[in-house]
A protein has these predicted regions:
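Glycine-rich phosphate-binding loop of actin/hexokinase-like ATP-binding domains
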Residues: 119-178
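A charged helix-plus-loop insertion that forms the helical arch/lid used to bind
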Residues: 68-83
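Conserved NAD(P)H cofactor-binding loop of Rossmann-fold oxidoreductase domains
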Residues: 59
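Conserved A3 ("GATE") glycine/threonine-rich loop of ANL adenylate-forming enzymes
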Residues: 11-12, 107, 131-134
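General beta-strand structural signal in soluble alpha/beta enzymes
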Residues: 99-103
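ATP-binding/phosphotransfer module of carbohydrate and carboxylate kinases, centering on a glycine-rich
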Residues: 1-54, 62-70, 89-97, 111-121, ...
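A conserved beta-strand->loop->alpha-helix hinge within the catalytic CA
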Residues: 86
Length: 291
């Protein structure tokens, strides 16, 4: 079994080949340019290989309603050239193999729950914190969709009273978590990128405040057995204990569970990073083949 995997990102595309267990055998990447140019690069990678199926874990929003005539299309993305682009249909038609598509963060949570930091769990959340913020949910062993798919980055937050930003940087919402806690928000707030902030900078406590709100919202709604925090901003490892401490404080003793007595094991880093999304795409391909 040879599985094709595509992690379609707003900045770059990562293509991979994997075996039936999700092990990545080969990978390459290309910049995300105009759709037709980028599609040519993707197909050049896969058409020389005899893949049995393709899994696509993509940036969004993406139409995931199985009965929709635009299933698999990128929808109202800020990347204007990609709006309404039929990514799934174009790749499926060109490669002629079974295909599956989901969000990049749903791909990541699938991978981490099956093979990574949430291995063996049926209820898990994965949040990525970088240029944007997104989240994938595995509930009862199934990826969560619905009206569209979860848009965790745009959950509305309470602004910290000491935040220098009066509103977040999101063009759609004044007070969503992406607007306050993504990499560009940190740049706008402190006039320097997150990776340049000193370890003792108060910006990290502010970041933990917003990410803790996000985690608590998830705990109160989808009740995950583990929360995985990934993405470029989380490279600052000291952020993890700060988020855990803030979550404990915000919970106020609510949600009595022995699991929460060990926050170090509850809110964790991804084990498969930076390949969580690519491995997830391979697992989506395996599902497509099984159907």
């Amino acid at each position: 079994m040879l599985l094709g995997a595509l992690e379609a990102g707003g900045t770059k595309m990562v293509m991979g080949l994997a075996d039936g267990d999700g092990n990545i055998l080969k990978q390459a990447s290309c910049p995300t340019r105009l759709p037709e140019e980028t599609l040519g690069d993707i197909l050049a990678f896969f058409q020389g290989e005899k893949i049995d199926a393709l899994g696509i874990a993509t940036f969004g929003p993406v139409d995931l309603r199985a009965d929709s005539p635009t299933f698999g299309n990128i929808t109202n993305t800020p990347k204007l050239a990609w709006r309404n682009f039929p990514l799934y249909a174009r790749l499926k038609d060109a490669l002629g193999v079974p295909c599956a598509i989901d969000t990049d963060v749903n791909g990541a949570v699938l991978a981490e729950a099956e093979l990574g930091a949430g291995e063996g769990l049926k209820n898990c959340v994965y949040f990525t914190v970088g240029t944007g913020i997104g989240g994938g949910v595995l509930s009862g062993g199934q990826l969560v969709h619905g009206l569209i798919h979860p848009e965790w980055g745009h959950v509305i937050m309470n602004r910290h009273p000491e935040d220098p930003l009066q509103r977040g940087v999101c063009p759609y919402h004044e007070h969503c978590v992406e607007g306050y806690a993504c990499g560009p928000a940190m740049q706008a707030r402190w006039a320097m990128p997150a990776q340049e902030l000193p370890d003792d900078h108060r910006g990290w406590a502010l970041e933990a405040h917003y990410l803790a709100q996000l985690c608590v919202d998830a705990m109160m709604t989808v009740s995950p057995e583990r929360i995985v925090l990934g993405g470029g901003v989380m490279h600052h490892e000291a952020l993890y204990p700060m988020v855990r401490q803030a979550v404990t404080s915000m919970l106020g003793g609510y949600l009595a569970s022995p699991v929460l007595s060990d926050m170090d094991s509850y809110i964790v880093a991804p084990r498969l990073y930076p390949d969580s999304g690519l491995v997830g795409a391979a697992l989506l391909a395996k599902q497509a083949l099984a159907q």
